[in-house]
Amino acid sequence: MADFSIITVTYNSENTLKRAMESVINQTYAPKEYFIIDGGSKDNTVDIALSYKAIAEKNGIMLSVLSEHDNGIYDAMNKGISMCGGDIIGMINSDDYYETDALKLVNESYEKDHFDVLYGDLRMCYEDGRSFIKKARNRKYMTSRDWNHPTMFVRREIYKDNKYKTETIHDDYDLVLRLKKQGAKFSVLNK
């Protein structure tokens, strides 16, 4: 069974953070640790994050909150990655949420496939209640439409040598392409 480290990068996220955090803390397969990496929010984001510390600990999750200036989302992600001790690292944006059994399904896939990188389908929800499923695909020649960043889980050893670049808004896609080129084992969870 794998230990999970989950990272949420925030900046002025007081309106969306609660749902994201609750979706992590209430997993049927709890993560080992959960990091909130905040870019120096001016609203109540940090207070909201800290208010979940006791609940997280009750569920066996070590919650850490770091708030300081960063150089954008990928810099913040790299900070979080450097703090992680779990076998598998997941990133969930402050305006996204996991289904209750997400980590259980990822762990089952890891036990079966021993992936380096896993990603899955993504339910896109609109404020008016409409939603659709963006299917994930694993092809030899990937496009940015084949994978869904909020559903991506990566073995910590892979991230150690492959940080996000912090130069453009497409640095997540750059990372996926670099990992593909290096021969990382990709797996898709279509659920």
What are these regions (language model features)?
Residues I89:
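Short aromatic/hydrophobic "clamp" motif used to bind/position activated sugar donors
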